Amino acid sequence: MEFRHHVRKLAGLSMIGCSCAGLYSYQDEGMKRSVYFWRHAFPIYAHYRVYQLLMEKIALPVDKQKQIYERLHEKHASHVFDIVLSLKGFYIKLAQAGSTRADFLPSQYLTRAVKLQDEAPSKPVSEIKYIISQSLQTSWDNIFTSIDPKPLGAASIGQAHRAILKDSGEEVAVKVQHPDAEHFFRSDMKTIKAFCRYFQPAHLPYLEEVEKQFMTEFNYHEEALNLEMVRDNLKKSPFASRVAVPTPKIEFCTKEVLVMEYLRGKKLLVGIQEHLECIAKERGMSLEELRTKQQKMDEERLAMGLDITLGPTQFELKALAVKRWIRLRYLQLLNCMPGNLVSKPLEIDCDKELNKKLLNVPSILKLLMDVHGYEIFVDGCFNGDPHPGNILLLEDGRIGLIDYGQVKRISLEHRIKLAKLTVALAEGSREDIVHALTVEMGVRSAKMNSYFLEKQARLMFDRDDLTVTEGMNVQSFVEYLDS
């Protein structure tokens, strides 16, 4: 086992050498990116891997392992994100995917990853206007009165701006693809797949699917058609009055440019952040103290095999809202009393504070699960890349769903098979899960081991918390399954 491991390391190092030689031969930008990745990312991976193997070999207690991993995270997190921000593209996409996993990603990485959900590096508006003019084959100002220089958000392959249509005066969002985004993605995928082939082969099938699915994001005209289809489907759903999908302006959509209805609201994460700040303030705690307390409660519940809590109950939320309203109005009254009219010693804008809404987070999460479940099992047409950066809390109280670049379609036959597997995972035994996976869905493995099949089904279609991975981190558990 150790021999094979060292062979893999040598092969990886040899590949770096070959890449460096190739750089001088071809001077291709994609090759430069590959060399940069291997030169900067591989030593970080090796540092983690060596410590992992050493700790396993000497059977170091879990608490000691956590301390060592914390030091490694502190040392490497900033360097990892320097690599991400330097290479952009697919690496930002990976960071965005990681940002949704607070239960998995260490805090040193999570805080940086969350910022990349809609704050990825952006290009100046002058370049955006040039791309629009080239793609639409007319000057941008023939279509738009103005384009806001500040991006609404920037993602892995492009960015979005608010604009005003010249003919109608309507406010729209304009999504523009960065030049070379597709070329760099193809090159980066080769690099990542090569890395996994040598060091994390269990992840290769997942990467193959990611590559296939992500390629659909490079045609914004197709995304406009996806928006139309999903929007029409949801208008016929039980959630029509509670969710909104923007209407695309098909006549202005090309492979590189997508023009659509502008939805007024804030990012879901911004709303939840304000919600948590309000709760912390009412409980006399800092936001960090609230998070620490909640994390401890979650760990205790998971250790007992219980689901984590998603927030205050409906009754607790109403009681908290009333208490908060009374406190803020009382402070407002104090500020208006004689003697305080000029100096206003209480530095608080009560009206602004009251505009920060307390959210029924469990209700919002249930709605999102219901909507995406409806897309999958009823419509057979769903967003293959849902993450918090693509979800808005609209001013009218609805949930806004944006970014349908990755839309997956599945037949009724496959939906039925997937539904049977989902029910088995939720309610059935190992035998039920294996039956749904192998007999119904036709999945095969080398040894057809029932333990292996059940765990793979849970990792892919259910969850990957410690109750599933038996106390190991996901990477170690996947390697354990492969062995």
Feature locations, PLM:
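N-terminal accessory/targeting segments that precede structured cores
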Residues: 1-159, 167-171, 183-214, 297, ...
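Helix-rich C-lobe and terminal helical cap/extension of kinase-like folds
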Residues: 70, 74-75, 101, 251-254, ...
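Short pocket-lining segment of the protein kinase catalytic domain that shapes the ATP-binding cleft
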Residues: 120, 125, 129-133, 231, ...
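ATP-binding pocket architecture of kinase catalytic cores
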Residues: 149-152, 166, 170-177, 181-186, ...
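Conserved beta3 strand of the Hanks-type protein kinase catalytic N-lobe
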Residues: 163-166, 386
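Conserved HxN/HPN-centered segment at the entrance to the catalytic loop
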Residues: 200-205, 235-249
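Catalytic-loop of the protein kinase fold
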Residues: 378-388
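Hydrophobic residue at the +6 position relative to the catalytic HRD Asp in the kinase catalytic loop
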Residues: 389-393
